[in-house]
Amino acid sequence: MVLILGRRLNREDLGVRDSPATKRKVFEMDPKSLTGHEFFDFSSGSSHAENILQIFNEFRDSRLFTDVIICVEGKEFPCHRAVLSACSSYFRAMFCNDHRESREMLVEINGILAEAMECFLQYVYTGKVKITTENVQYLFETSSLFQISVLRDACAKFLEEQLDPCNCLGIQRFADTHSLKTLFTKCKNFALQTFEDVSQHEEFLELDKDELIDYICSDELVIGKEEMVFEAVMRWVYRAVDLRRPLLHELLTHVRLPLLHPNYFVQTVEVDQLIQNSPECYQLLHEARRYHILGNEMMSPRTRPRRSTGYSEVIVVVGGCERVGGFNLPYTECYDPVTGEWKSLAKLPEFTKSEYAVCALRNDILVSGGRINSRDVWIYNSQLNIWIRVASLNKGRWRHKMAVLLGKVYVVGGYDGQNRLSSVECYDSFSNRWTEVAPLKEAVSSPAVTSCVGKLFVIGGGPDDNTCSDKVQSYDPETNSWLLRAAIPIAKRCITAVSLNNLIYVAGGLTKAIYCYDPVEDYWMHVQNTFSRQENCGMSVCNGKIYILGGRRENGEATDTILCYDPATSIITGVAAMPRPVSYHGCVTIHRYNEKCFKL
């Protein structure tokens, strides 16, 4: 059309005029002749915008059409208001509203570097900028000020790619200052994974106390052994010993001193002059010594292994009865609450028995007695994954309970087929002997038994076939005597107890209630309800929480549910299912070495 129009104009310029009919043919088209291609959408693509930007940048260099001068640190940058406003909402607000800068030719900007402004303008006028380790920080801050999110994100991405043990803590602090949550998380995870290397660098020694604690308290800290954490903390303290000495006790509460190798503990920790001159640390040292003697009997946040060491706390379920209670199960299986994995261990010997007692001694597991009147005692060696027969009970029994107190195993009460037993026996694993100690004040079967604050507690139980007891009987090994304490709020048998943080928790007995007992203050309180009534359930403390596994419901059938109760929040949740419904089983927590090291 343009060519035709051009030809027509040329003809007129030559003095040749077309007739009206010819003009109609030139400018009018017969609709019947249209084929659907009467228009053409043309686009030069992104190159058009790039060419325009390039021309604007040339204009800027030659000060052509510039209408504002940005002054930073005394250096002037001629610019175009339209270009700045199109790229940055900061400048759009400055130039488009009735601000003083919208009328002035010279605009001064403080708080940034001239180099940063040069890089920023290069990006604005070209869409490109070279981000380096030297300019990334001020370029990030400048793009944040001018609200250029694309450039800001590019700087954050660049920092993420530069993570190294020598700089990750500094980048993390930078990310925290600028609310870069993704970068902050990546920095923290990187530092957790490479803690051994990170702790050797200057940035680590410059952490503040809270930042250091945030790392050393983490279960996800990746280390080969706990000694690395202790040494890192001591390096940090000795860096500014006069200022940091008062923080030593607080820091060591987050180091898992009980998990240090006994030789290292004696030869390195106990002889450290700073620790020796800090009486407030003595209790932590005492806890570690006790753990080396008593093992898992003494549980605290510091006895829980970090998963990266290859060890984890697992719940071991021993035997039990299947759904309708008519078949005894031979299985010994461990459950890892963190991964949700179940693994089979060596099967329980002579599993034809039922209603035996189970407890953990150090990192091994004992099973005693069983129906009918068994005197057998087996110990599971967790390192060798085998069951070994040890010295038999003096008196056969079932429906009894076992607990460990100060390194000794106590078998309490039970039933011999005719009478409830008041008999209590104590096992010394070093001499492999059982000895009788003071009997219960009230003979019971199926009570809850646990140790706490240096004493043994026997709660509830059945004094005969038809009644339940609400008595709480407390045994003191120093005096070899029993005392009655505050009664449990509801008389029950077939209940289970665990101790955590110097408190005793009781569940089961075909009630929904979970009760908590404070042995120091001698009082009970109701803390939570389960989702259904059950008895003869398993109960164990793992990773600082209480797990209730299986049990028998009101209809007599076993259940496969697993509940998790967190005393810190008083929240109870259903977390998983067992491999099969089970009741009358044993549940204990031990440390188990995993085939693979769990890392982030």
UniProtKB/Swiss-Prot annotation:
Coiled coil: none annotated. Residues 168-270 form the BACK domain. GO terms for molecular function: ubiquitin-like ligase-substrate adaptor activity. Residues 66-133 form the BTB domain. Disulfide bonds: none annotated. Autoubiquitinated. Autoubiquitination leads to proteasomal degradation and is necessary to control KLHL24 levels. Kelch repeats lie at residues 314-363, 365-407, 408-454, 456-502, 504-544, 546-592. SUPFAM superfamilies: Kelch motif (SSF117281), POZ domain (SSF54695). Expressed in the skin. Found in keratinocytes, dermal fibroblasts, and melanocytes. Basal-layer keratinocytes have lower KLHL24 expression than suprabasal keratinocytes. Expressed in the brain, spinal cord, liver, testis, heart and at higher levels in the skeletal muscle. Pfam families: BACK, BTB, Kelch_1, Kelch_KLHDC2_KLHL20_DRC7. GO terms for biological process: intermediate filament organization; proteasome-mediated ubiquitin-dependent protein catabolic process; protein autoubiquitination; protein ubiquitination. One of its GO terms (cellular component) is adherens junction. It is found in: Perikaryon; Cell projection, Axon; Cytoplasm; Cell junction, Desmosome. The keyword Protein transport does not apply. Gene3D superfamilies: 1.25.40.420, Kelch-type beta propeller, Potassium Channel Kv1.1, Chain A. PANTHER family: KELCH PROTEIN, KELCH-LIKE PROTEIN 24. Forms homodimers. Interacts with GRIK2. Component of the BCR(KLHL24) E3 ubiquitin ligase complex, composed of CUL3, RBX1 and KLHL24. Interacts with CUL3. Interacts with KRT14. It is linked to Epidermolysis bullosa simplex 6, generalized intermediate, with or without cardiomyopathy: A form of epidermolysis bullosa, a genodermatosis characterized by recurrent blistering, fragility of the skin and mucosal epithelia, and erosions caused by minor mechanical trauma. EBS6 is an autosomal dominant disorder presenting at birth with extensive skin defects on the extremities, leaving behind hypopigmentation and atrophy with a whirled pattern. Cutaneous fragility and generalized blistering persist during childhood and decrease in adulthood. This is Kelch-like protein 24. It comes from Homo sapiens (Human). The gene is KLHL24.
